[in-house]
Design a protein with these regions (language model features):
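Short, conserved phosphate-binding/catalytic loop or strand-edge motifs used
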Residues: 116-128, 165
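Surface-exposed loop/edge segments in extracytoplasmic proteins
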Residues: 111-115
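DNA replication initiation on ssDNA origins
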Residues: 1-91, 163, 171, 190-197
Length: 198
């Protein structure tokens, strides 16, 4: 039986025994749209093991169908999602949603991401470089590495280690009013993901 894409992605990104994940949902809106003062789709699921995330899937799918975007914190936090609560850096990441194709191709060729997440369209990508459990990178070092990717086309606003990015396996609901709800998907690159899954 195949696993849910969200579980496959999270396990490939961080297969450590101690791994936990922070999942957040909120109403998915286009940039600049007015946000609800009290968002009925805002949910925070802190310190979730992979098994607990599996148990959350039905609730996440229901929230997604109601118009929520499904996001996760790229690194491990203890409690509330904020930079000072990041307890373990598990990856270097970059948001290439606004990059041009030549920039994306150059990063693929030179840096070989462990995982590519395709958020919508042909040039909307998030790249991850999973770290081995033996690596010990602190928050300032990780953020410096993330910022270095800005020169290659990454979003400068998405370099913090407590960043929320879209979780594969769920629909991108930002433009549902235009009947555009692409599935967020992940592919595993030539670099070895942390969990050793290609």
């Amino acid at each position: 039986m195949s696993r849910h894409p969200a579980i496959e992605f999270l396990d490939a990104l961080d297969s450590a025994i101690e791994a936990t994940f922070h999942i957040t949902t909120f109403t998915d809106l286009p940039k600049g749209a007015e946000k609800p003062k009290l968002d009925p789709l805002l949910k925070e699921f802190e310190d979730q093991t992979l098994v607990q995330v599996e148990h959350l899937l039905p609730a996440l799918e229901q929230l997604n169908a109601s118009g929520a975007g499904i996001f996760f914190c790229v690194n491990q936090c203890q409690g509330k999602r904020k930079k000072e609560n990041v307890t373990r850096v598990r990856c270097v990441h970059a948001d290439f949603d606004s990059a041009i194709q030549s920039q994306i191709d150059a990063v693929r060729q030179k840096l070989r991401p462990s995982i590519e997440v395709h958020t919508s369209g042909t040039t909307k990508h998030h790249f991850y470089w999973a770290l081995d459990t033996a690596d010990d990178i602190d928050v300032p070092t990780a953020e410096a590495m993330n910022r270095a990717l800005v020169d290659l086309g990454a979003d400068p606003a998405a370099t913090d280690t407590s960043r929320l990015l879209r979780l594969p396996g769920f629909l991108h609901m930002k433009y549902r009013d235009r009947d555009e709800t692409p599935l967020v998907t992940a592919t595993f690159g030539q670099a070895q993901p942390k969990g050793g899954k290609q």
